[in-house]
Amino acid sequence: MAYSYTEKKRIRKDFSKLPDVMDVPYLLAIQLDSYREFLQAGATKDQFRDVGLHAAFKSVFPIISYSGNAALEYVGYRLGEPAFDVKECVLRGVTYAVPLRVKVRLIIFDKESSNKAIKDIKEQEVYMGEIPLMTENGTFVINGTERVIVSQLHRSPGVFFDHDRGKTHSSGKLLYSARIIPYRGSWLDFEFDPKDCVFVRIDRRRKLPASVLLRALGYTTEQVLDAFYTTNVFHVRGENLNLELVPQRLRGEIAVLDILDDKGKVIVEQGRRITARHINQLEKAGIKELEVPLDYVLGRTTAKVIVHPATGEIIAECNTELNTEILGKIAKAQVVRIETLYTNDIDCGPFVSDTLKIDSTSNQLEALVEIYRMMRPGEPPTKDAAETLFNNLFFSPERYDLSAVGRMKFNRRIGRTEIEGSGVLCKEDIVAVLKTLVDIRNGKGIVDDIDHLGNRRVRCVGEMAENQFRVGLVRVERAVKERLSMAESEGLMPQDLINAKPVAAAVKEFFGSSQLSQFMDQNNPLSEITCKRRVSALGPGGLTRERAGFEVRDVHPTHYGRVCPIETPEGPNIGLINSLAAYARTNQYGFLESPYRVVKEGLVTDEIVFLSAIEEADHVIAQASAAMNDKQELIDELVAVRHLNEFTVKAPADVTLMDVSPKQVVSVAASLIPFLEHDDANRALMGSNMQRQAVPTLRADKPLVGTGMERNVARDSGVCVVARRGGVIDSVDASRIVVRVADDEVETGEAGVDIYNLTKYTRSNQNTCINQRPLVSKGDRVQRSDIMADGPSTDMGELALGQNMRIAFMAWNGFNFEDSICLSERVVQEDRFTTIHIQELTCVARDTKLGPEEITADIPNVGEAALNKLDEAGIVYVGAEVGAGDILVGKVTPKGETQLTPEEKLLRAIFGEKASDVKDTSLRVPTGTKGTVIDVQVFTRDGVERDARALSIEKSQLDEIRKDLNEEFRIVEGATFERLRSALVGRVAEGGAGLKKGQEITNEVLDGLEHGQWFKLRMAEDALNEQLEKAQAYIVDRRRLLDDKFEDKKRKLQQGDDLAPGVLKIVKVYLAIRRRIQPGDKMAGRHGNKGVVSVIMPVEDMPHDANGTPVDIVLNPLGVPSRMNVGQILETHLGLAAKGLGEKINRMLEEQRKVIELRKFLNEIYNEIGGRQEALEDLTDNEILDLAKNLRNGVPMATPVFDGAKESEIKAMLKLADMPESGQMQLFDGRTGNKFERPVTVGYMYMLKLNHLVDDKMHARSTGSYSLVTQQPLGGKAQFGGQRFGEMEVWALEAYGAAYTLQEMLTVKSDDVNGRTKMYKNIVDGDHRMEPGMPESFNVLIKEIRSLGIDIDLETE
């Protein structure tokens, strides 16, 4: 097996038993693929597929004018180049987007000609606004912030059948309903009422009998009955009737007379109920007709009109109940044939017939008018208006679209075989839905489960952006139609017709403020990936928190392998926001698919198929862990399987599919929890969620006990630097890596140089620090997709969210009561949990009414000491250590002229000055913040002079760019001359460059020439001369290209910045704040075991083992049993073994043992105790030594979820590490030196520091701002508010009878304005008295009572 550059430096011992059939797919594919599909960038006119932008344009164009004399057609579109790259957009606070240019064709028809001859055609490109681009990591930069568009899980379009679960009617009767949901357009509902009539609703308005809709479609009563019922035919023979017999229809009826066969034998006696046995006998006897008395048809319903044979007079309309009067008329008129509807109470109810009876309309027009009245109450209906409205509802492609998915789901549900068809409904569709609904009511067929993932689909970014874009285009369409009529008379061009503002506004609104456009969670790489793999049921067209019930939030059997059953937020959104499972993907219809291995007759193949929830229902699917022999055959007699969404057991021969991996059930975050199978689900949920809140520590530390997914997450998240192409590291420093690309990967005519600029100390969305550190050194060979630099929270290309801590589970002096955590001071000294937070502070200079604000170091009434960190431009220098209240940017604002006192006038006359007409509005460091300035950015509006600081920043940026380009040129030049050298050495020169004719060229000769002189050489072979010329041209060409690139960047830097109206200058100051761990910070493990640091103890007081090694953390053992997250105990044991093995390897290295011994010991670890075998023999001795050095701090282990280390393997590892197999050891109290009375579980657990830091929450106030109306102090840290002394606290003081304290709280400390000013003055004077007055809220109360018209006054004595 081949190891990558970083993998072979530190191999993880993997305990998995099952082979990798399939790698975990690229984790951001769902975002990138969807948006790539939407843009179709780089496609030519013929290559456009009917999706995304192209589809949106095609659905709106051509736009035809109202008169029909002009049309605007769509030809194609192209995307321009982005103005700035991603980093520049983030810095400048602009959107990373490309201009969209659409080619349209304006066609003007000749009015005079009859056949619409074309008079004029104009074609033009029109600018249609900017389209945001997705970065390579699946995010968008909108106004300088990284955002993610979360995918939405919504109800698929199609038709759904349901019932009310007996809740509507008091009898508990099930009322069935059907609903046709289009992708866009009106909803159509059919429903039964308690009397079993069918009603229809359009867009949830008032209901009408369903027959009204059928009549509006043009069906007559007879056609409707014909469609829904079969008929019984009776031939009238005198007093009796002969029934054309269909024996099946008699089942369950009571025989009205003896039924005899041809031979006169009685088959059914009169008065007996007819059973299936009787029907068999009747079918055998072959009776075709049955004679029944006339009153047999009483109460039956006619299926056809009964007409008097002689006069043509109508005796009974169709759908009329036959009574004795009608029967009398029939007998009189000698009618020969009567057709009645066949209905019964079991499986063929008279529902449609009953509905027709309550329907007041009798023809199509009346039905259309009735629908018009329901849709537009109060408007007078006309025939045309009614017809237009009805046609637009379901039959017009502009207003109604089922979409391809909707049509597919619709056809499948009503039992058709073809899955394609029109996007609008037709008559047959509506009748088919009604038939299916009636069948379900009759007991044939079942209702749908709307939480089944076959009925819910995922809308990804691309699709939602397309919908928004279409909305914008439809707005444009209206305006264009108006203007088209003027187009021919005024000779307008397409550009004059189209106003792109509505489109741009719709797109901007979607990306900027849609509910699904979320601020990217950038705490750590895992939170980024999770954010992009989210699936939300909320958002436009989705559910709302308040209305979502339990069923929607619950785990459904179809979630298996598609949506993670564990990872979802706690709180009101539980179950509505989910995460995609590790292997899930969407199919072309947007349904989630999961991969399976194909199983044929008990033999498991390596063929993999992706199936959606609907497709997998009929399969019998075995678990990934099902037992197999070497021939890949299932060997158990019965295998645990899933079939029809149920868990059962089946014989191996019945199995058709098998899971690809045990971790296919869970999401990325859950698959990072080792021993997940031993944790309670609720705690696993907390563990998954808390990993996303871990703050990247100063020095990342890989988990000793991981799951093997860490490398995938780090690689796919995009925080690491991954080699685009293989090659040799040419140079490397802290901020860039330069790779000379391997010859076989260089494309012709390009430099063969890859320069990777590393991100240094940049602020993330969550104010954490993003910093990349190189892993490679000069001369190293790297392959494509090797990891060359670590990002935040990654260690050698593996995700590293926390630190491995030595922990003990023991109750200790109550310091770890109720989940508190007791830490050792060593953790602080070693900076294990020190994190860097970067804060961005902004100072804006605006143009005010009284004049412009100015950024300057000349600030009135501020001492020298306060200005000592500012430069002459008034901006703090980089590297300054600043604390709360320090000035970062000096700024003065003009203030209005005030009336001067005579003294001031005199002073002014003497000192002559205008300093007092400005006030100090400088940017200061906020309270509670202390840090180092690491960067300053200055943005200046066009036309405003740039200060010295802005110019120096620009110069340093230009130098950086120049250095990059020079480096690139140096390598290009070097590589070119190397190729020339290999071509020239050993060849003969003709002269030139001071050489004689016939002289052989050697390395020494070439070294003696300057590079420029090489091109003057004349060689004997023409091919070589040509090569020299080409090389010279290539180098000149590259130089010119790089100079152009530099000029382009320079132009961008020097042009003014696009600032908001009224803003002259913006200065951004970045502060790096170092936060050590301290009491009050929240910490957690990966198993939902969270707690708050309660105390930090000196190292010498901590419990220690017999060797004197103290523990770092003491955790409470009582936190484990009730919470049932035993995974943390197993992790602790395995962590102890991992650390012990590392120490053994360290001792071997210190004793300088032979490599062969090292190999033997490593082989014991990796290949002799269960799990995956590692090919250590492929590594050279140096690589083995490198590996051993990296294993000194512990051998990292991987225990994949549901396929991890067994207890026996953990014990074997402990034994190999010379540790007690129980995982427990005798500890001693550091303060007394006494032994604790029983052995304690000690080991290594991976602990995270969460982004809930006490520094961000701690807050105190003495005086500050007050609310405007009530004059009470504001609340909350952000407003610098006070602590609320609430109702219950008042009761407490009342209960103690502390009257003066209570009075103080309710008056001078709250909203007694005069009292609190006096109090302040008294304290300043050293006189500690208070004079309480009237609280302001009392005055508010009086005002409110007066506003009710009650005159109220306070009587003061």
UniProtKB/Swiss-Prot annotation:
Q: What is the lineage of its organism?
A: Bacteria, Pseudomonadati, Pseudomonadota, Gammaproteobacteria, Pseudomonadales
Q: Does the keyword Phosphoprotein apply?
A: no
InterPro entries attached to this UniProt entry: DNA-dir_RNA_pol_bsu_ext_1_sf (IPR042107), DNA-dir_RNA_pol_bsu_external_1 (IPR019462), DNA-dir_RNA_pol_su2 (IPR015712), DNA-dir_RNAP_su2_dom (IPR007120), DNA-dir_RNAP_su2_hyb_sf (IPR037033), RNA_pol_bsu_bac (IPR010243), RNA_pol_bsu_CS (IPR007121), RNA_pol_bsu_protrusion (IPR007644)
Protein's recorded name: DNA-directed RNA polymerase subunit beta
Which biological process annotations from GO are given for this protein? DNA-templated transcription
Q: The organism sits in which domain of life?
A: Bacteria
Q: What NCBIfam families does this protein map onto?
A: PRK00405.1, rpoB
E.C. number = 2.7.7.6
For this chain, the family text in UniProt reads:
Belongs to the RNA polymerase beta chain family.
